[in-house]
Amino acid sequence: MTEIDLKLSDGRTLHAYDTGADDADGRLAVFWHHGSPNIGAPPEPLFAAAEELGIRWVSYDRPGYGGSTPRPGRDVASAAADAAAVADALGIDRFAVMGHSSGGSHALACAALLPKRVVGVVVVGGWHLLAPRGSTGSKGSGRVARPTCARRLPGEPH
């Protein structure tokens, strides 16, 4: 796996990872969006299967994580611009996205905001805060989540 520091036009640095830098032709690039508080290193236990399937893992540390500099005012939607910047720097036109835990929302943002570039999306163990509008943080979200899930998913255990 190759690690690179990409300098963006706004002066920030994104620390990126690429398992296919030496053999990119014909391989599907899959952008890995990490959960919190992890860094962006793609899931090494999946490398062998990815190699057999012709998958190239690409990722980056979200702003403020690992080797990436912070992005003031960052929101989930800004992940699309960052992923596009990494793809452009690596010469990747179209790619799939995969997110784990809180990275799931970042993967979904990429799929929604980059529809001409993202060919597929996978979310593994994604989460969504079900706290009431206007609340701060996730304190007490479990109390809110249970009845909300019960209404949205009748018949499921909560």
Give the predicted meaning of each segment.
Residues 97-99, 124:
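Short beta-strand immediately N-terminal to the catalytic nucleophile in serine-hydrolase-like folds
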Residues 99-103, 107:
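Gly/Ala-rich beta-loop-alpha elbow adjacent to hydrolase catalytic centers
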Residues 42-43, 68-73, 134:
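Conserved catalytic-core motifs of eukaryotic protein kinase domains, centered on the activation segment
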Residues 12-67:
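Conserved HGGG/HGGXW glycine-rich cap/lid loop of the alpha/beta-hydrolase fold
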Residues 78-96:
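Conserved acidic catalytic loop of the alpha/beta-hydrolase fold
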Residues 119-158:
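Alpha/beta-hydrolase-fold enzymes
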Residues 109-113:
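Active-site signature of alpha/beta-hydrolase-fold catalytic machinery across serine-
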Residues 1-6:
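A domain-start/cap signature at the N-terminus of enzymes
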